[in-house]
Amino acid sequence: MLLDDELLSDIIKIPPFRYKIISAFEYDFIIDAMFGIGLSRDVTGVYAQIIDEINRVSAVKVAVDIPSGLSAGIVQVSNKKVKADYTVTFGFDKTGMVLYPGRKYAGKVIVSDIGFAVSQDNVQKILENNPARMIEKKDILTIPEREADGNKGTSGKVLIAAGSRSMGGAAFMSAQSAYRSGCGLVRVFTHENNKNALLTLVPESICDTYNDKNSNCDELTKWCIWADCIIAGPGLSVSGQSEEIVKCILQSGSDATLILDADALNIISENEEYYEYISRYKGKVIMTPHVGEMSRLTGKSIGQIKGNPVETALCYSKEHGVICVLKDAATVVCDHDNIYINTSGNCGMATGGSGDVLTGVIAGMMCAGFDDECFAAALAVYIHGCAGDMCRKNQGTFSMKAWDIAESLSTVFTQNNTDYN
């Protein structure tokens, strides 16, 4: 490790240590251990030269705890940072290298247990620097077992209000992924134009419809009361009629968990009074904006949101009393007490309909029997990413489609030895 000459001399009263930069081209492996996890300034001088030298060579680069130039608890990175092939981090993942852009520099992350003493003070210090938790593959095993004498009703009843005249596919993908994620009954409330296609693609679903002249809110209210979980918004469009449908759901008197996605979010961003409806809704509310939708909801620029997604999601969650699922390359899930950052998934999932599939997975986890809805939502995001990673192996990032992701869900569950095996 390189130490400042004067600082070293002052502290331990020995003659100054002299170092020289050795060409990194001479080595097959480079261990990066220059800085700790709390770096909060730009890297300058000889350290900047060393980082440039390390990044120029083809040697395998292994960072200790965190790549030099990154900080554990913040998204912003310094002007110079080591681009590691591997990072061996101690005790737990660090937020600054799980979120982008830091994630691009960490390479494959290996968490090493070095026997941190678990005390209240230690836990508090860890949370101050690294407030977020990362879902792991082993968390899939926490999905509650199904009752041996259960039935389709006890496995979870989901209502999906989705699909306008020209965007029926969103409803189909949400329904398919809800079934693939363990839901017992899925009822789709959609435009009448979508009925035949829905019953062809997802014949297990129950279909109720509205048309251009009649929003059928009386029937919709009845099915809101019936449901254990409601999805509202995918492909719904933004119109007077879709506003009426979303308002009907929020004022239905249902206590079902409500997932607001896509056009439901766009409607809310244009109608401030809907926040009052949300505050009076009896059940738990989950909002699932991508960064563009979050920009419209908050008035922040996309750059501001990407610059600090954890703070953005957490503030929004606390302000409106909802679980926020802020979707991006590293999705953030939070409520007023918990923060999760997703580590699964890949760039091939940036395709139309991927978010609609996610809403179905979230609905599945809401119906699975978890006591903690925020954890269940974060687990759903992780499972969705695992399905995308499976598609990367089978279809590749260039060619995967949202339907492929939905169809890969069952393999994620069976390969991880859940009760769905």
Each predicted region: which residue ranges?
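Internal gly/pro-rich beta-alpha loop/helix module
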Residues: 27-29, 34-128
